[in-house]
Amino acid sequence: MVAQFPRRMGRLFLPVSTVGALLIAGVAAFSVRAQIKTVSDPRERHFANVRQLTFAGQNAEAYFSHDGRRLTFQSQRDGYDCDQQFVMGIDGSNVRRVSPGIGRTTCGLWMKKDTRVLFSSTHGGDPACPPKPDFSHGYVWPVYPTYRIYSVKPDGTDLKPLFPRTLKPGEESGYNAESVLSPDGSHIVFTSDRGGDLDIWTMNSDGTKPRQLTRTLGYDGGPWWSPDGTKICFRAYHPETAEEITEYKSLLKRHLIRPTTLDLYYMDADGSHVRRVTNDKKQNIASFAPSWTPNGKGLVFASNRDDPKRRKFEVYKINLDGKGLERITFGDQFDGFPSFSPDGKHFVWASNRNGKEPHDTNLFIAEWIP
C-alpha cells in the first residue's frame, strides 16, 4: 500500500501517501494541455461503460466490499491535509468518512460480511499529519513508525485498535500497514517492521498470533490474497550489492525506503515457495499495487515499464509465470491501484485522466470484458 497520489518527479512518477501511499515534494506540474479530457481510450479493450466516481482532488486505493455494492477509498477531500478513509456506493453515492479525521491513514479494505472496515492510521501516535520526508536525499517513501491497524464500522463508529492492540505510554507502534483480509475472513496479511525489516506477516483476524512470512533483506509490501486464499502476491525491493544494502539500512533507520525499482512476487499463504513474477531491476522499473485476476492465474498491477523516463504509470496484466504481459490502460499520465469486484464483472482504478486540475487523481469503474 504502501501506497498514493500520482505526481511527476525526477525519474519516477508514483502515487503519494506512505508505502502504497507516497508523499512527493518538489513536484513538477503537468501542463493543463497535458490533461486528458476523456474517461476512456479506444485501446482499453477490456473496459465497457467506464464511469468516473470522484471529480476533484486526490482519491485512490478503492476496493470493493464483499457484496460488490460499496467501495472503500482514501482521499484528501473536504480540506484534509492527510489521506482519510471513506466508503461510498459503486455509483459514487453516499460518501461517508469512516476514519477519525486526524493523522494519516492508508489501505482501507472490508472485513468479513462488510460489517467493518480495516485500515491503518498514525493518529494514535500524533493527531497531526506526520512530516513529509526530506527529499534532499533523493526520492524516498516514508515508512511512518506510528502506523497502527484499526477497524471501524462502515458508519464511522466503534473505532478499535487491532494491531498492536495495546501500547505502553510513549511507545511507538512501529510500521504496521498494507493489511488485507483473507477470503475466508480468518486471517489478515500485512507489512510490518516489527522484526527489524519491512516484511510480510499474517495474524488472526482479531489481531492475535502474528507470524512472519518473508525474511529476505529489503522491502516486502503490498500483499494480497489469491481468490482461493492459498497464495499471496506482493511487491518487493531486495538490495543485493554492498552499496545497495548500506543505503537500504541507512534509510530504514530513518523510516524511509527508496522505491525506484520494485518487482512482483507470489508465495504460498504460509510463506513457502516464493516465486518471482517480474525481473526488472536492471531496467529501473517499478511495479506496484498487485492484485489477483478473478481466476487466480494472474495479476493486475501498475508499472512505469513503458515510459523510458519512468514517470508515467499504467495498469497491466500478467500471468504468474511472468508471461502474457498485457497493457490494460492508456491514460498516458497515471493509472494505478487496480482491483476487481468479487464476481470479476467490474474493475476499479485510480487515474489522472479527466481531472479538473493538473494534479487531480480520481476513481473510475468499468465493466470488465475478459
Where are the regions that the model predicts?
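Blade/loop signatures of beta-propeller domains
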Residues: 35-48
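Predominantly a core beta-strand signature of beta-propeller blades
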Residues: 49-52, 93-96, 146, 157-161, ...
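A flexible loop/linker signature enriched in serine peptidases of the S9 family
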Residues: 55-58, 75-85, 100-104, 120-149, ...
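Hydrophobic beta-strand positions that form the internal "hydrophobic ladder"
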Residues: 68-72, 117, 188, 232, ...
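Residue-level detector of Asp-centered blade-edge/turn motifs that repeat once per structural unit
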Residues: 66-67, 112-113, 183-184, 227-228, ...
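Bacterial N-terminal signal peptides
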Residues: 15-28
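Short loop/turn segments that connect beta-strands within beta-propeller blades
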Residues: 89-93, 153-157, 204-208, 268-272, ...
